[in-house]
Regions:
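Asp-based, Mg2+/Mn2+-dependent phosphohydrolase catalytic module
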Residues: 1-6, 16-19, 34-41, 139-143, ...
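N-terminal helical cap/lid subdomain that shapes the substrate entry/recognition surface
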Residues: 3-10, 14-134
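Long, compositionally biased
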Residues: 74-77, 145, 152
């Protein structure tokens, strides 16, 4: 059956979020190294560890897991949008979570300095916001696909944060006929419901769409669950799990068109 629509994940599929976060950590941890004799990489590891532990201790954790908001997004998110009451709790928790993650990270390296912890907690969001990084082939491929297929962006995350990421690269959103953010919908990938919602917006059956994403546990598992073909973009040579098998594996977005052509042959 002919492909009528292409569904894209956002983070680490079209936007290189992992690199943006890494560079923000490097800049912030290097600032800390100006104050104390520490290894910035060790501080980054400590803050990531403390942030994850804190994040998973909150009563909001099951909700953030369902929506698909990770601990490091929490280090720069404001959580000012979203109708669910959990977003108001996250909005309230965010300042102390961000401060405590950095303060505890410093403490793990033997540094008791709440003032510096607060400074770093305020610096990290600014550093992350200054780094909207797009993969080099993103616009080339979207330009190639636009007009041939309906395009839908299907992204997990907090509404305000995902919109902010898109605002940082303003030429990206206009390529899409529809944009679905899990925090607005109320459930994230791999839930069947969010894929059904996408198909309804596009007016397609599962066989008429193809999902492109970098995460086996969300993009690929979810599209597999509804019988939609998919392409797992594996830029870093990751190993496949035994439980989740993509229909196709690609290393660049430039591979998309030739695979669609083969599906329609």
């Amino acid at each position: 059956m002919a492909i009528k629509a292409v569904l894209f994940d956002l983070d680490d599929t079209l936007l290189w979020d992992e690199r943006s976060v890494k560079e923000a950590f490097q800049a912030t941890c290097s600032e800390a190294a100006k104050h104390y004799d520490i290894d910035p990489a060790q501080l980054e590891d400590a803050v990531r560890r403390e942030a994850r532990a804190l994040y998973e201790s909150f009563e909001t954790f099951p909700f953030t897991k369902k929506i698909g908001i990770n601990p490091f997004e929490g280090l720069w998110a404001r959580f000012v949008e979203g109708e669910q009451e959990e977003f108001r709790k996250l909005q309230s928790l965010a300042p102390s979570y961000q401060r405590d993650s950095w303060t505890r990270g410093l403490k793990a390296l033997g540094i008791e300095d709440a003032e510096l912890g607060l400074k770093l907690a305020e610096m990290f969001p600014a550093e992350r916001r200054n780094r909207p990084i797009v993969y080099e082939e993103t616009f080339e491929v979207l330009e190639q696909l636009k007009g041939k297929y309906k395009l839908l962006l299907l992204t997990n995350g907090s509404p305000d944060l995902q919109k902010e990421k898109l605002a940082g690269v303003p030429q990206l959103a206009p390529y899409f006929d529809h944009i679905i953010i899990s925090g607005e919908f109320g459930e994230g990938k791999p839930a069947v419901s969010i894929f059904e919602h996408a198909m309804q917006l596009l007016g397609i059956s599962a066989e008429e769409g193809v999902m492109i994403g970098d995460k086996l546990t969300t993009d690929i598992l979810g599209s597999n669950s509804i019988g939609m073909r998919n392409m797992w973009i594996n830029r870093h040579g990751l190993s496949l799990s035994d439980e989740i098998t993509p229909a196709h594996e690609i290393t660049s977005l430039r591979d998309i068109q030739k695979i669609i052509d083969s599906l329609e042959a």
